[in-house]
Amino acid sequence: MLKNNIEVDVKVKCIESGITQVQLADSIETTSSYVNRVIKKKDGIINKTFVRMMEELGYDIALIYVKKKVE
């Protein structure tokens, strides 16, 4: 099972970065409706088969976010 709530994670990271989802979509050259659809889709981020494989092996999945270092 995916332990993260992707929708909340993206919204929090947008707030931390001081941008909106619309601005995020613009910066990655896509639409805000597509960004919204991706983060709301339950199996859109992690492949369902991968989740089943990890569950069968006795694991849950937890994503961690590491801030990129600016040089």
Give the residues covered by each predicted segment:
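DNA major-groove recognition helix of helix-turn-helix/homeodomain DNA-binding modules
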Residues: 48-63
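A short, Lys/Arg-rich alpha-helix, primarily the initiator
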Residues: 1-17
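Short amphipathic recognition helices of helix-turn-helix/homeodomain-type DNA-binding modules
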Residues: 65-71
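Helix-turn-helix DNA-binding elements, focusing on the entry/boundary residues of the two helices
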Residues: 21, 32, 47-50
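Short alpha-helical "recognition helix" segments of helix-turn-helix
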Residues: 24-25
